[in-house]
Curated annotation (Swiss-Prot):
Keywords: Hydrolase. Coiled coil: none annotated. SUPFAM superfamilies: Thioesterase/thiol ester dehydrase-isomerase. Catalyzes the hydrolysis of 1,4-dihydroxy-2-naphthoyl-CoA (DHNA-CoA) to 1,4-dihydroxy-2-naphthoate (DHNA), a reaction involved in phylloquinone (vitamin K1) biosynthesis. The active site is at D14. GO terms for biological process: phylloquinone biosynthetic process. This is 1,4-dihydroxy-2-naphthoyl-CoA hydrolase. GO terms for molecular function: 1,4-dihydroxy-2-naphthoyl-CoA thioesterase activity; fatty acyl-CoA hydrolase activity. It comes from the Bacteria. Its EC number is 3.1.2.28.
Length: 143
């Protein structure tokens, strides 16, 4: 499991002063990107690879508590490989720390494809290694 720390910023909130669902999913994606960087994956090369793309094909989020500007978040990421071309990431979002209130739970599902043919392809070795690393019992903390 990886743990990502984040502060809710004013720009993350809507007119009602709370984090909007699309923004919460964006924060989850930010945590995903940080976990890739922690695994020494070059994000520029990863997201611009002409041989492969790994788009999100499904996303969901459930809120249990509102998130307000200035609140500190602790986001737990746990990923699992579903197929040789597919994985999902579960995010648990806590206010303050995991001992605090659970504010939300999100899920994103990703599929590896060839960007030209748009056909599924096997996850690259670096992603299989990332999946193994993120699922170790020892937590890695990301800031």
């Amino acid at each position: 499991m990886m743990i990502y720390y984040r502060t809710v910023r004013l720009g993350d909130t809507d007119a009602a002063g709370v984090v909007y669902f699309a923004t919460a999913l964006s924060i989850c994606h930010e945590a995903y990107e940080a976990s890739l960087e922690q695994a020494y994956i070059n994000l520029r090369k990863f997201f611009n690879d002409p041989e492969q793309a790994i788009p999100i094909v499904h996303g969901e989020i459930d809120f249990f508590r509102p998130l307000f500007c200035g609140e500190k978040l602790e986001i737990h990421l746990l990923a699992r490989q579903l197929k040789d071309s597919e994985f999902e990431i579960e995010y648990q979002i806590f206010k303050g720390s995991s001992e605090g209130e659970k504010a939300a739970r999100a899920l994103t599902r990703h599929v590896c494809i060839n960007p030209i043919s748009r056909q599924r392809s096997r996850l690259p070795d670096l992603m299989v290694q990332w999946l193994a690393r993120i699922n170790t019992t020892e937590s890695e903390r990301l800031y």
